[in-house]
């Protein structure tokens, strides 16, 4: 065999090997692209306390590993802290609103609770349990609770305070509902990926308070769906950050910004009108028309109120071709969220069938 033919032979082997490697790389790239496309990014947006973190907890319960005993134990301290935070907020509001305690001993109880550094709370000592129970049963505090729209109080306050005896028992382990109700403001970005039908749903929760929103910007790439939460019960409340601004107006302004962002032109928008249970309670004594004069429906009818609120948000969408998918929700109700998210999942998959090679 001549030198030339040997070189040609070697060269053709090299070419073959090179082609094989190239083909392998191309195949891997196609696989990577396909796999990347099998991940759906869902961005959870909404103002502070609209229920985003609770929604993520529900995804963990419904589609993830849930909460083990050990996980639940990790929430014990937070439940105690939520109770102290709620009672301290009411004690401060008693002064601001000039409401008197009916029982004289509650002045001393209020002083005792006020001086607790909530962030250092890790146990629930008997003297504090007793003081909190006595305070909660005071008609003055009950009047203060009824006027909670005039100050900032967590939605979970009543849930925990009516159950102090159970929470104060030794060996207390938070229930799933206790975990869902714990309020910890979200700072930074929380991602929760879960696998459904061989597709990864990556849910991203960003803090809703104003100071947190500037951190959102880099979450905006490749978003499949925006899931925007509105607290229906906030129509008569003011912002944590600014006590002369209506919370629902703030939520509307944020939604308007989101639906007009060029980033989201190709993202579907799903609107969760959350806290429908709180709206049903509140609408009986706090009239929507007092805060939104354009409401001309019947008073004390939750259905009329929520339909009006839905229309207010849908009307902010400038693109008549873009459908806003909406659901009324109660984020602390696991069965409600299971049902709603099944519908949402079907919507998202239908909208992305071709894009994600799902057909």
UniProtKB/Swiss-Prot annotation:
Region (G2 motif): 178-186
Pfam families registered for this protein in UniProt: G-alpha
Binding site for GTP: 46-53, 180-183, 274-277, 331
G4 motif: region residues: 270-277
GO biological process per UniProt: action potential; adenylate cyclase-modulating G protein-coupled receptor signaling pathway; entrainment of circadian clock; G protein-coupled acetylcholine receptor signaling pathway; phospholipase C-activating dopamine receptor signaling pathway; phototransduction, visible light
Subcellular location(s) of the protein: Cell membrane; Cytoplasm
Amino-acid positions noted as binding Mg(2+) in the UniProt annotation, renumbered to this chain: 53, 186
G-alpha domain sequence ranges: 38-359
Membrane topology: Lipid-anchor
Keyword check for GTP-binding: yes
Claim: Membrane is one of the keywords in the record: yes
Highest taxon of the lineage: Eukaryota
UniProt KW keywords: Cell membrane, Cytoplasm, GTP-binding, Hydrolase, Lipoprotein, Magnesium, Membrane, Metal-binding, Nucleotide-binding, Palmitate, Transducer
Record's catalysed reaction(s): GTP + H2O = GDP + phosphate + H(+)
Annotated spans, G3 motif: 201-210
SMART domains cross-referenced by the UniProt entry: G_alpha
Gene3D superfamilies given in the database record: GI Alpha 1, domain 2-like (1.10.400.10), P-loop containing nucleotide triphosphate hydrolases (3.40.50.300)
Function: Guanine nucleotide-binding proteins (G proteins) function as transducers downstream of G protein-coupled receptors (GPCRs) in numerous signaling cascades. The alpha chain contains the guanine nucleotide binding site and alternates between an active, GTP-bound state and an inactive, GDP-bound state. Signaling by an activated GPCR promotes GDP release and GTP binding. The alpha subunit has a low GTPase activity that converts bound GTP to GDP, thereby terminating the signal. Both GDP release and GTP hydrolysis are modulated by numerous regulatory proteins.
Quaternary structure note: G proteins are composed of 3 units; alpha, beta and gamma. The alpha chain contains the guanine nucleotide binding site. Interacts with RGS22. Interacts with NTSR1.
Descriptive protein name: Guanine nucleotide-binding protein subunit alpha-11
Organism: Sus scrofa
Annotated gene: GNA11
């Amino acid at each position: 065999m001549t030198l030339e033919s040997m070189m040609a032979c070697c060269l053709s082997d090299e070419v073959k090997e090179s082609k094989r490697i190239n083909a392998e790389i191309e195949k891997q790239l196609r696989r990577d692209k396909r796999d990347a496309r099998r991940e759906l990014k869902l961005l959870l947006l909404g103002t502070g306390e609209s229920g985003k973190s609770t929604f993520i907890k529900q995804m963990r319960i419904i589609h993830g590993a849930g909460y083990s005993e050990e996980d639940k134990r990790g929430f014990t301290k937070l439940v105690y802290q939520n109770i102290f935070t709620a009672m301290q907020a009411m004690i401060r509001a008693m002064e601001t609103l000039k409401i008197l305690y009916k029982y004289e001993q509650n002045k001393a109880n209020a002083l005792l609770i006020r001086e607790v550094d909530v962030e250092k709370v890790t146990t629930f000592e008997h003297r504090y349990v007793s003081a909190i129970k006595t305070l909660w049963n005071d008609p003055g505090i009950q009047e203060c609770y009824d006027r909670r729209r005039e100050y900032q109080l967590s939605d979970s306050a009543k849930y925990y305070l009516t159950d102090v005896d159970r929470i104060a028992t030794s060996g207390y382990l938070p229930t799933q509902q206790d975990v869902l109700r714990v309020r910890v403001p979200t700072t930074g970005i929380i991602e929760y990926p879960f696998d459904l039908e061989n597709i990864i749903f990556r849910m991203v929760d960003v803090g809703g308070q104003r100071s947190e929103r500037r951190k959102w910007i880099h979450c905006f790439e490749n978003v499949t769906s925006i899931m925007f939460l509105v607290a229906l019960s906030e129509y008569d409340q003011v912002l944590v950050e600014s006590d002369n601004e209506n919370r629902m107006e703030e939520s509307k302004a944020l939604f308007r910004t989101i639906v007009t962002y060029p980033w989201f032109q190709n993202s579907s928008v799903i609107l969760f009108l959350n806290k429908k249970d709180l709206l049903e309670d509140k609408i009986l004594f706090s009239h929507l028309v007092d805060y939104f004069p354009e409401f001309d429906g019947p008073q004390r009818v939750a259905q009329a109120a929520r339909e009006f609120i839905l229309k207010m948000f849908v009307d902010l969408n400038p693109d008549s071709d873009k459908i806003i998918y909406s659901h009324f929700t109660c984020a602390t109700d696991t069965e409600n969220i299971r049902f709603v998210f099944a519908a949402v999942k079907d919507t998202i998959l239908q909208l992305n069938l071709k894009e994600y090679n799902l057909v």
